[in-house]
Amino acid sequence: MSIARNIAGPARRQAALALGIATALAAAPAQAWRLDYFLELALEHNDNVLLSETDPISDTIATPALGFDLRNDGSTVQARLAGVVEHRNYFENAYGSELLAEFDGMLNWVAIPGRLHFVVQDRLTVQPVSLAAPDAPDNRQQINIFAAGPTLFFRIGPTVNGQAELRYIDTWAQDSAGFDSQRLSLALRGAKQLGPGSTLSANLQAQRVDIEGAGLASDYDRYDAFLRWRRNLRSFDLELDAGYSWLDFDDGGSRSSPLLRAMAAWRTSERTSLSATAMRRFSDTAESLIEPVSLDGTIPAPTLPPGAISGDAAINALPFRETSFELTWAYAGVRATFAGGPFHRRLDYVADDGPDQTGRGAQLGFGWRLSSNHRLEVDARVERLRFLATGIENDTRYLAAFLHRSYTPHWSSRMGYTRYERDSSETGLSANQNIWYVAVTYTR
């Protein structure tokens, strides 16, 4: 791996993102921006840092961290830039120090009100080098997805609103060279209001994908055509997509498949809700990772998970057919909160040698306000991940319990424990891990 490749990828994206932010700062008044941030110093003891099955090594890790959340909801600029960076220092030298960062950013500049917007979007995250291996420090890498381009709004007759989007997309991975790509995407949309809370839209999308690295994967063109029906009621939201997708590869191959998506949310009461998502479509890792960042300001504020920041995506640029379903029940009471449900996801890669996989399991989060300044949080997840080509099957179980205490509006602390278990059918990939954790946080 060359130093040039490690530096050049992030440098291009950082320069483009900085240009977009500078443009927005110039266009928006200073008082329109709001900045929240936190500083944290954490100490953890990990009894199996490298997640070894036969030779566990324990260590104590000190982790200073900085998180920020910058927002603007003005008429000319709408933006949310949220991130966290942490530096992990291993006292017993079980592993070298780590600098890890995550960032979600979306910026929309209204160049001509009602006519022309310019969008800049970026996501930096930590993901595994190999999804089949345990989440040890030597199996982590930074990846980045950057997108930018104009959106043009127009009318088609008296009742149909039109929209044209052009995006340049750049993807980069620190170690997985097969993820690096440049893309150009064009979308045309027309939406008609059918009645109160009901909209029907027609969508045409085309994308050119050029993958860096000769022989790693074939470049290809992707085309999507689908109808979207959206219904919003007082206690129920429904969105249905139906259409078709085509993939045309430069090496002469082609694939096609129906595009089906359904998303429903039912607010059963003032405090409870039930949501479900099901889909069958062509996708790829870059698309699935950048989708959570949207123009409606739903970028999650930065938080620090127990242990190291890390994701669970297979990092490559290969397209796959995704079949997935997720059900979530949520409750938000005066003292207690709960969210959880099952999930299932199957990825069938278009390439014969792709890492086809099936994952299913369940996850939940529970919170309880013990007093005005004490809160208990519990997170749990179980998953079975099976790689179809090799037959490798990994069962993982994760449990975390944390007690948060607030001292002043700015100062707080948390202490807790996490347990991670991994049972693999492949020799050497099973492991258990216990982490004890304490942290002091300043929030502004």
Regions found by a protein language model. Give the residues of each.
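Gram-negative and organellar
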Residues: Q31-R444
